[in-house]
Amino acid sequence: ALRRSKETPSVLICAGTGCIAGGALKIYENLKNECESRGLPVYIGLKHDSDEEKSLHVKMSGCHGFCEMGPLVHIEPMGVMYIHVKPEDCHEILEKTVLGGEVIDRLVYHLDGTAYPKQEDIPFYKKQHRVVLENCGTSDAEDIEEIRHTSYTERVNVPNAAARIAFN
């Protein structure tokens, strides 16, 4: 599994069907090419067998649930969520946000004149308690050990009474 610190920047491109239909695969390719053309020490993809730390991680993630705003790009550790991203935005995202720490206002969610750069502050997500999608973009779906430790079954909380009935 990929070993990286909490400070290692991660660019997560939503790979849900809506985002893919909107061009997410081209966004992924453009970000990958931008990184490679700059010679950035970057890890591209989900599975990483080396212990070597990289300065940037670019990967496709599961659906973020905000399909009508896709394609979505989520940048960690900043927590920034970009909406309606186009392939031609990749250079600016890499330059300004990933390398420069600057938020690109035109790519963040706006509602009633208020900008919401962080996913956690977007009203759509604000009152959600994510259970199944809690690890979306952070867990590696190709790593069986990680799946074992972050599986859906761990997320299920069966009340004691129901468990007694089911197992008696």
Regions found by a protein language model. Give the residues of each.
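Feature of Fe-S/electron-transfer and energy-metabolism proteins
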Residues: A1-N168
